[in-house]
């Protein structure tokens, strides 16, 4: 096999270039097999080198062959050429060359063969070596197998040994466990033994201690025993010697012994001395040396110590310097600290002083605040007094109106349009400013109410006072009627100057007069009945259809149905709401103003509780709680309750907007509030007013307005026009109820709707009170005669019960102020109602401004003629309420609760007069008024007589005014509307002055605030007079301005004078004088507003 491979290699080697280089190597490596891979790899280097050499040799030889072939070819070409011989010769040469080349090639082949053979031999040797190696590897496999078998046996043996070891380990572990158990047992035994040993050791120690003690004792006893023995022996020897006696022998022996002893002592002493001297010398030398050494040592130590001392001294000096520096710094810091402490103490002192001063200032401010509050209360009281005076004047005016209307009915001429609306526009403008201030007052009242405590028992007292105040309101309404008549007379005079009344205004007064005539015709019993004659408000309650609301609203005045339904004009709420024009809701719904519950919420009208609660809901506690009446705000309200004028002031403050927009109050209240137009229908259909009144009546029964409305109920006209009756009661009660709600619930005044439209705030209250007033109206409507008498009796009871409402309803008086602020015409119809003294509050509410402008515009002469007596009566009444008010404010200051009671009593005092007047007026015509008089306190009977005479005078004056007012109304309305803005500005200025005057006067005394209020009132009067003058300006501006200036001067002087004098001035016969009285009334209204 190897030979074949070698031969193949030898043969194929030359041709390797043709077949490719590595065929030989491939074949060899392939044939070598797996066994010869290593040998091939090992000999690859030599083999490849040979292959390369062989290939190179072979590659050279073909070139030789190719060279020979090319030479022969060249010879062939030469021989074939034309020169054949030359070619032959050349061919011969080329053959030789070819032969030589071939020979050379052959020689080369031989050499190559030799080399290949040698190489083959070497390869055979390698192959043999490889075979040997393969055989050796087979032997190694066997060796490996043997070793593997041996190792496996060893592994088995080791496994067995391991198993044995595991068993041994387990046995050892068991032994260890046993040993541990034994160890534990031994440890326990050892511990026990140690404990026993310790116990024995302690016992041994104790025994040893006892033994030592016993040994000591024994030793002591032994010593004592030896001592005793020696002592005993000595005693025995002495005794023996004494017994034997001393012999001579013994003496000699003793002497010899003594001599011997002496000799021995001397020698001993000599020896001792010699020894001592030697010892002394040695000791001295030793001591000297010792001292010297010691001295040297000490000197060295001293030197060292001196160095240390020096360094220490230096350090000490340094430390001293540092200490001094520190001490100086410390002193400086102490000084700074002391200075800072001083500064701190000074600052603290200053701070404390500042705090004390601030506290003092706070206390002063508090005292000032309280004083201002009391002053405001006193001013409200003064305003109430003024309103009382105005109410008296209204009553007189109403009486005159009734007389005039009665005369007209008798004569038979148709009602002439009144210029009631003319004076009103001026007033509403004033009322707007009044509203602004009234809202502020209401806020103060609300604060005071918050401070007060609500007591149900007090509410009853307040109700009693409300009944009294209702009577006062009636009287005041009678006064307002008189004032309205005077105002109408003035308007007539002005109308003569300006005889261009708007058709609507002319129509409305005519309608009012017609409606009054109709009402009088309807309720001839009323006009005839002394009660009706006495209560011209009831006789005029149909006239209330004439109520300024309709008279004011020319549209309503045009609509005969509306004038016919005096309920609307009568409804003081309407008169109030016209004044409320500021409160668009009230202006829009004069019906609401009339019976806010009717127009605004029939449900409220239906729900007397709701009617009651508008103010009561707002401040039910206020309406209910005399404490609120007691509350400083209510202290003001009690004062207002005492003097409905003051109560009216908040309403007037609310009604300034109403006064500002008299036209709105006139027409907007009625035109805007179809409810009013509807309410006239209600006035027309007493059944309807009755139902709202019934719905409202529960509240009205509570409200003194009921007492007022019963009077209206007394008037058959009112029974006929229950709406009118309701409205007068409403006007009365709304005024009263509104004011109480407002006075009681400044929250209502605060309530944006109420604050915005104080008239509305009042009107909701009015809605409540109208309902109350309506309830008596319902009774009256049900049984005009019965309602008149029984309801009067009932309502007086209600009034007695309701006086709290009236006490609460100083704002009711306020709402009447709204009515007054609305239109003199409305005030006039209310005045027609006011003869009853029920409407006086309404007329007062209406007349705060309404009566004033009518007085200013219509006929100061009439006012002069009519009001002197009436005003005197009113002033007397006002003086009484003022006194009561003054008392009550003081009491309120002392105690918030007591003042309401006192206020109720005071109210009862002034109101009995008004109630007596009203009740007696009613008593003359009817017996029903008598129960009212009894319930209301049938105090003076003379006053009712006066009121009846005044009512007659008022009727006569109203008839005259109706004629003149028709002419004056159109011009006056325009003039008044122009005067409104000016009046508003003037009122605002006067109110600011009044507030300033109030603030400076801190005294708690009510008299001082009253004085301040009085000057403020003249200023307001001036503003109102200026308004009237402005209204007259189109006709007589220069003249009016001069008059206003004179009036202002007279008023500025007059404020300090008593209110009675003011009332007298208002009733003065001269126009100028009548204007100042009007100013006084206006001032009163403005004060109430404040």
UniProtKB/Swiss-Prot annotation:
Residues 496-506 have a biased composition (Low complexity). One of its GO terms (cellular component) is mitochondrion. Residues 243-264 are annotated as: Linker 12. The modification Phosphoserine is found at residues 74, 122, 345, 416, 419, 508, 523, 529, 535, 541, 547, 553, 559, 565, 571, 577, 583, 589, 595, 601, 607, 613, 619, 625, 631, 637, 643, 649, 655, 661, 667, 673, 679, 685, 691, 697, 703, 709, 715, 721, 727, 733, 739, 745, 751, 757, 763, 769, 783, 789, 795, 809, 815, 834, 859, 867, 888, 947. Residues 412-1090 are annotated as: Tail. It comes from the Eukaryota. Residues 468-495 have a biased composition (Acidic residues). GO terms for molecular function: protein kinase binding; structural constituent of postsynaptic intermediate filament cytoskeleton. Residues 522-892 are annotated as: 52 X 6 AA approximate tandem repeats of K-S-P-[AGISV]-[EATK]-[APVQ]. Its main location: cytoplasm. Pfam families: DUF1388, Filament. SMART domains: Filament (SM01391). Residues 265-286 are annotated as: Coil 2A. GO terms for biological process: axon development; cellular response to leukemia inhibitory factor; intermediate filament bundle assembly; intermediate filament cytoskeleton organization; microtubule cytoskeleton organization; neurofilament bundle assembly; neurofilament cytoskeleton organization; peripheral nervous system neuron axonogenesis. Sequence repeats lie at residues 522-527, 528-533, 534-539, 540-545, 546-551, 552-557, 558-563, 564-569, 570-575, 576-581, 582-587, 588-593, 594-599, 600-605, 606-611, 612-617, 618-623, 624-629, 630-635, 636-641, 642-647, 648-653, 654-659, 660-665, 666-671, 672-677, 678-683, 684-689, 690-695, 696-701, 702-707, 708-713, 714-719, 720-725, 726-731, 732-737, 738-743, 744-749, 750-755, 756-761, 762-767, 768-773, 774-779, 782-787, 788-793, 794-799, 808-813, 814-819, 833-838, 858-863, 866-871, 887-892. Expressed in the sciatic nerve (at protein level). Residues 99-130 are annotated as: Coil 1A. Residues 131-143 are annotated as: Linker 1. Residues 144-242 are annotated as: Coil 1B. Residues 456-1090 are annotated as: Disordered. Residues 95-411 form the IF rod domain. Neurofilaments usually contain three intermediate filament proteins: NEFL, NEFM, and NEFH which are involved in the maintenance of neuronal caliber. NEFH has an important function in mature axons that is not subserved by the two smaller NF proteins. May additionally cooperate with the neuronal intermediate filament proteins PRPH and INA to form neuronal filamentous networks. PANTHER family: NEUROFILAMENT HEAVY POLYPEPTIDE (PTHR23214:SF1), NEUROFILAMENT TRIPLET H PROTEIN (PTHR23214). This is Neurofilament heavy polypeptide. It comes from Mus musculus.
